[in-house]
Amino acid sequence: MTSDDSSQKQTQEHSHKQDFQYSYPLPIYYLTRFFDKINGLVKLADKFETLLLRPKLSEVRIDRPIYITGLARAGTTITLEMLSNHPDVGNHKYIHIPMTYLPFLWQSFALKVNVFTERAERIHQDGIIVNRDSPEALEEVFWQRRFSNVMDESKSNIMDGLIDDDEFLRFYKTHIKKLLFAQHKTRYLTKNNYNVTRIEYIKRVIPDARFLIIVRNPINHLASTIKQSKLFKKMSKNNERLEVLTQIIGHREFGPNRVCINVDNTPTINYIRELWKNDPNDVEAWAIYWNSIYEYVKNVLETNEKVASSTLVVNYEDLCDNSEEIIDKIIDHTGLSKRRFRKVKKIYAKKLRKPKYYKPEFGDEDIQTIK
């Protein structure tokens, strides 16, 4: 069998997999929805957990937390997965989905229950295998609860260094400490695509934060994004659970409920929406959106020296093609121990490859639009 035949077979197999009806485990769905509806009581439980752990938390230090961000499908998840295997790193996991606010008490309870222990391909059907111990992006639960504009694409979502919210900051830092304590780790790691407009704010309130901004070739990136959006739209039609759960945990990048990130460019967002009305997969719309986000990031890095010095821009293609070199740069930038990451580095140097289960299907006109 030739490599082309093999690739075609993989593509066909992946296409057939897309016909299945994805479902989160029912206990996770119902618990997540229940706790979302009683959020006031959940916040009281959070305060109780904090009080319970207060003597221990005084000994926990937030040291150079690592923030992975960039547009969805850029390679942020595989970067999260890789770094989460560092023995010093603590992060949110699938096990935290129902009760993200209680990283210690909920984890202590959930680990005793035999739910979601089997490994399976995640909802995105992109070859990433997960179970309850796998890293997951859950921070948006807090941001969207506290700040009303973060999921409102008609308003600027930029949080710069001028914003003050002492109450949220106390909660946020305490939560990080509780998560690190619960996992016996020293370095906090998080992935949140929506944090791309908050890097200036995060840098101001956590001065030693480290940022990894993942960038991908726009042709492949948009092909992956459009494919994913089609998939989510298809799955959401007959799966209310998927739609509800992704809204609760703040995963709104794809499908009928996707929310654009507004970088103080409402007219541009409106234009994108007009294009999507005619065609939800309009290449021009996605290209404009991609450019607006990374142009904003470029401007921040050029005008904010403090943020720039704390940021490493990682090209996804370089990460796949020159894995060892780029992994070393990531570890150097984050300040994680290279020695304690050697085995993981070897594994991911072999594992990191550009996706083969699909290929961009753009015509010449589409490619020119993207360029």
Q: Which residues does each PLM region occupy?
A:
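A conserved segment at the C-terminal end of the G1
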Residues: 77-90
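PAPS-dependent sulfotransferases, especially Golgi type II membrane carbohydrate sulfotransferases
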Residues: 1-59, 226, 233-371
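Conserved phosphate-donor/acceptor-positioning beta-strand/loop module used by diverse small-molecule
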Residues: 191-193, 202-227, 330
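PAPS-dependent sulfation machinery
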Residues: 95-188
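Hydrophobic anchor at the beta1->P-loop junction of P-loop NTPases
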Residues: 68
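P-loop (Walker A) phosphate-binding loop of NTP-binding proteins
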Residues: 71
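Short catalytic-loop micro-motif centered on adjacent basic/acidic residues
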Residues: 187-191, 313-315
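Pre-Walker A (Motif I) flank of P-loop NTPase domains
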Residues: 62-65
